[in-house]
Structure formats: structure tokens, C-alpha cells
Amino acid sequence: MVKVVKVYYDDEVSMDILKDKTVAVIGYGNQGEAQAKNMRDSGVHVILGLRPSGSSWKRAEKDGFEVYTIEEAVKRADIVHILIPDLVQPKVYREHIEPYLREGQALGFSHGFNIHYKQIVPPEYVDVIMVAPKSPGKRVREKYLEGFGVPALVAVYQDYTGNAKDLALAMAKAIGCTRAGVIETTFKDETESDLIGEQLVLVGGLIELIKKGFEVLVELGYPPELAYFEACNEAKLIMDLIYERGFTGMLKAVSDTAKYGGLTVGPKVIDDHVKENMKKFAERVRSGEFAKEWISKADKASEVLEELMKPIEEHEIEKVGRFIRKMSGLER
């Protein structure tokens, strides 16, 4: 059964609940900087909670924010919005946030991983909400400055005060997301669909599809540069068309030859066997097996990722890609 979602827009959401409240954004990276700036520009009192030795402290001060240690920011805040990487969140939460929480505060997240997989277990006397813009931080900020916004997801995990949903929607509006539209979801659905999408398509599947297409062309004797153009470079053009017009709009924009070849051969390459394989790995996410595996590597995540990236970094497609990007003026 397909779930029906509720979408909220700008004129349906009030920011009144944020009046006289302080939002402490924990972290000043990709999302932290964008969300903090947008909320501040929307009239919300925003402070930053950062490590004193961190490089982002001075940058946040330069950007005009009040910056405190994480502990002090939590003490001063009504809403503690945690925007640091998934694997470091539990330790930071246990040591620097949880001991200073008080009744009626709210914990905010932009990804449900640690709540859904019980790496963070909040006390019962706080609200727990999620506001998850569906774009990188840079675009979240750019679209806000253009007078628009990016779509977002909102969810409530724990509603101690009875106002958690209104709070999440108000924060989404302050970030600019209700200008585009905000979809109500759950921590479970956001977390699992995000991980499944990353692994099957956006990061895992896409890289392997492009890489294997490149390898086939090269193995058949075509120059690597031509292979790169056909398997990788032009993928952006197609994705831009899909992003702007959908599948049908993209197909109407390409040549009839490309259309016929793609529609007749594509389903035979990405066939039901591939779909079944996708379902198998989606179940690893749904069962918690993937999370358990990734969490077990938390202490050595950098080394693990470095090792996993080596074959990609050393692949011929990367060497050729650098050459093509220089030709295109994208790299020096």
C-alpha cells in the first residue's frame, strides 16, 4: 500500500512558536552553516555550539554568530539542533549534551539515523524532531537568498510538550523550506529511504553503473576519453533533464535513436535480477544490519573509508576524468 504524504507550504505554517526562543545549532559544517544563517535571517535567535579547538569556531564568529562550547550552548537553548556527522553524534550527545538537557527543551536532527537505530536515546522530558532539507547545505543557502527554498522532510519522534510538530514546521519555515514544500514523515521512513537511496542508486549504484559502462567501452577498444564522455560526462546532461522535466521530458529531449535504444535495451541491462539484488540490500538497511556494521567501524571510520576509496581513486576513469575536466575548464 502506497503511503499518502502531507505537504505543508509557507502560508500554512506560523513561526510564532519560535518567538523568544533560542536555537543552538551544534556544528557549523555543510548543513549547520546554511541552516543557522537561514534561521537567523528569518528572525530566529540562533547561537552555535562548537568545540573550542575546532576550525569552525572562528569562522562562525566571523559570520556574526554568538559561539559557545556545546555544553554552554545547550544550557542557553530552547532547541538543540544537532548537525554534526552521524558517527560522532552519540559520543558528543552523551558527553556534552545529555547531562545539560532540561525539561521542555527540544532536540532537533536533520537525519534520523541515531534516533532510529537507538544510538541516541533521549530522555522522556524533551521533544525530538527532525527538519531535513533535501539538498546540500550550499544549495539550501543559495535558494533561500534567491527568495525561494528547497523541499524538506519533517518528523516528530517524541512530543513531550504537545508542540513538537508546530516547532518542526516553524524551523522548516525559518530555513526557507516551506517556500518549496515540506513533507511530513517519520524518523524510520526518512532514515531507511535515505540509506537505501544512497546505496542502491545515488552513491553506490550510480558509481558502479558508470564505471562498468566505461570499462565495457574501453575493453571493446574505444579510446578512454570517448568512453568517459559517453558513460560519465553526459550523465550530468541526462540527469539535469530528468531533474528539470522528469523521465518523459528527458526522453522527449533526446534523439529518436537514443530514445529507441534506451527504451529497448535499458530494461534488459537493468533487469529483474538487478531489482532483486537491490531488494536484498535494501533489507540490510531495514533489518538494521547495515547500521550495525557501520556503527561497529566508528572508531576507525576514516581508515575504512580510505581503504574503500583506493580502488576508485586508482581507477582509469579518474585519470581520464581529470583530463576531461581540465579540457572543460572545471579543473586547472
UniProtKB/Swiss-Prot annotation:
GO terms classed as biological process: isoleucine biosynthetic process; L-valine biosynthetic process
Pfam families, per database record: KARI_C, KARI_N
InterPro entries (UniProt xref): 6-PGluconate_DH-like_C_sf (IPR008927), KARI (IPR013023), KARI_C (IPR000506), KARI_N (IPR013116), KARI_prok (IPR014359), NAD(P)-bd_dom_sf (IPR036291)
Residues given in the record as Mg(2+) 2 binding sites: 194, 230, 234
Residues in KARI C-terminal knotted domain copies: 186-331
Keywords: Amino-acid biosynthesis, Branched-chain amino acid biosynthesis, Magnesium, Metal-binding, NADP, Oxidoreductase
Cofactor: binding comment: Binds 2 magnesium ions per subunit.
EC number from the UniProt entry: 1.1.1.86
Ligand binding (substrate): 255
Binding site for Mg(2+) 1: 194, 198
Span of domain KARI N-terminal Rossmann: 5-185
Cofactor(s) for this UniProt protein: Mg(2+)
Protein's pathway: Amino-acid biosynthesis; L-isoleucine biosynthesis; L-isoleucine from 2-oxobutanoate: step 2/4; Amino-acid biosynthesis; L-valine biosynthesis; L-valine from pyruvate: step 2/4
GO MF terms held by the record: ketol-acid reductoisomerase activity; magnesium ion binding; NADP binding
Origin: domain of life: Archaea
Signal peptide per UniProt: none
Family assignment from sequence similarity: Belongs to the ketol-acid reductoisomerase family.
Record's function text: Involved in the biosynthesis of branched-chain amino acids (BCAA). Catalyzes an alkyl-migration followed by a ketol-acid reduction of (S)-2-acetolactate (S2AL) to yield (R)-2,3-dihydroxy-isovalerate. In the isomerase reaction, S2AL is rearranged via a Mg-dependent methyl migration to produce 3-hydroxy-3-methyl-2-ketobutyrate (HMKB). In the reductase reaction, this 2-ketoacid undergoes a metal-dependent reduction by NADPH to yield (R)-2,3-dihydroxy-isovalerate.
Protein's UniProt name: Ketol-acid reductoisomerase (NADP(+))
Gene designation: ilvC
